[in-house]
Amino acid sequence: MERHSLNTSVKMPVSASLACKNYDYDYDSIQPYFYFDNDDEDFYHHQQGQTQPSAPSEDIWKKFELLPTPPLSPSRRQSLSTAEQLEMVSEFLGDDVVSQSFICDDADYSQSFIKSIIIQDCMWSGFSAAAKLEKVVSERLASLHAERKELMSDSNSNRLNASYLQDLSTSASECIDPSVVFPYPLTECGKAGKVASPQPMLVLDTPPNSSSSSGSDSEDEEEEDEEEEEEEEEEEEEEEEEEIDVVTVEKRQKRHETDASESRYPSPLVLKRCHVSTHQHNYAAHPSTRHDQPAVKRLRLEASNNHSINSSSSNRHVKQRKCASPRTSDSEDNDKRRTHNVLERQRRNELKLSFFALRDEIPEVANNEKAAKVVILKKATECIHSMQLDEQRLLSIKEQLRRKSEQLKHRLQQLRSSH
């Protein structure tokens, strides 16, 4: 079964047959564990025709180590030939199946490689079989020394680099550096998530033999310091942004609370009814009382008008005292409307009194207390026209009498002068 590697480069091909895998850094390369290819747990591709080995599963961490992890830094080791790959895989797996896990098409990362045999995964921070791992590593290193001697004998087919095997022998003394596990800087990650804590140091018994480890360690420490500083700056920026968001939310909540308080406790509206007495004509009353009604109605109307005006003015003063809210415009409109209604009632009452007085002056409808306004107006018009005609007739008679009197005076004067 072909496994996806955790250290795949960005520039490497994606296909399963040509996937570049750091098999020498995977713990499974030293002590492999496999699963059956079930439908529920088909996490990895497998080669057709390959038999599935048995799955020893006592340790719970053996299941988690097969899960995929975030991509890591590209491999810096030299690319191996197909013959070397076959020999290495047959040594580790004890199987005749050709594994293409060491094929790497990119030559930019073939100058050096990471010198750690432990898998570059944060899951190894909780691995409980450290002693067992050290034992297996020491045994496999011895087998690698023997294999190196066999491979160096055949220079045509085997071109395994001596520094590669030496670095394998010295890799047990090195610990995993956080910059190796998390090779990409935080600014290029798109702020997808915060970097986990670095793995604990696992020191093995094999002493170091290469002098290049000190330089790489110092570079790794510098990279680690830079990453920590960038991480702190990003955390501060995120905290500032969060604080700004909280302030805006609080402001909105305050506004919402003020709106809710205004809606729950609106400003009290002082609404007082103005008692305006509307006096209607008593059509059922006796005709003898028609002359006394206008004066009484006028007195009552004046008293009611004074009372309504006083009440409206008092309501206006009370409203101005109590209403100190944004709804003062509405209250003023209500006061104006109320005053207008009072004045309109007063006008109607005066109009009724005028009709009643006019009806009493017309002889034809003077005794008809149920006469309509239109009838009163028509009869009043006819009465006016008749009065005008009578006036003209009387004026003409007066003029005739004046002339006749003048003639009589002139004749009397002549008679006196004759004597």
Curated annotation (Swiss-Prot):
Query: Which sites carry carbohydrate?
Result: T69
Q: Which UniProt keywords apply?
A: Activator, DNA-binding, Glycoprotein, Nucleus, Proto-oncogene, Transcription, Transcription regulation
**Entries under Pfam families matching the protein:** HLH (PF00010), Myc-LZ (PF02344), Myc_N (PF01056)
Its main localization is: nucleus
Return the annotated region ranges for Leucine-zipper: 394-415
**What GO MF terms are annotated?**
DNA binding; DNA-binding transcription factor activity, RNA polymerase II-specific; protein dimerization activity; RNA polymerase II cis-regulatory region sequence-specific DNA binding
Q: State where the protein is found.
A: Nucleus
Gene3D superfamilies recorded: Helix-loop-helix DNA-binding domain
This protein's GO cellular component annotations are: nucleus
- Tissue specificity comment: High levels are seen in the kidney, gills and uterus.
Location of motif 9aaTAD in this chain is 87-95
SUPFAM superfamilies reported in the protein's UniProt record: HLH, helix-loop-helix DNA-binding domain
Keyword Nuclease in annotation: no
Residues annotated as domain bHLH: 335-387
Asked if the Swiss-Prot or TrEMBL record annotates the protein with the keyword Nucleus, the reply is: yes
Q: Which GO terms describe its biological process?
A: hematopoietic stem cell differentiation; positive regulation of cell population proliferation; regulation of transcription by RNA polymerase II; regulation of vasculature development; vasculature development
Give the Low complexity compositional bias ranges: 305-315
Role: Transcription factor that binds DNA in a non-specific manner, yet also specifically recognizes the core sequence 5'-CAC[GA]TG-3'. Activates the transcription of growth-related genes.
Its domain comment says: The 9aaTAD motif is a transactivation domain present in a large number of yeast and animal transcription factors.
The entry's other comment says: Alternative translation initiation from an upstream, in-frame non-ATG (CTG) codon or a downstream ATG start site results in the production of 2 isoforms with distinct N-termini, shown in this entry as isoform 2 and isoform 1, respectively.
Subunit structure of this entry? Answer: Efficient DNA binding requires dimerization with another bHLH protein. Binds DNA as a heterodimer with max.
Q: What is this protein called?
A: Transcriptional regulator Myc-A
State which gene encodes it. Answer: myca
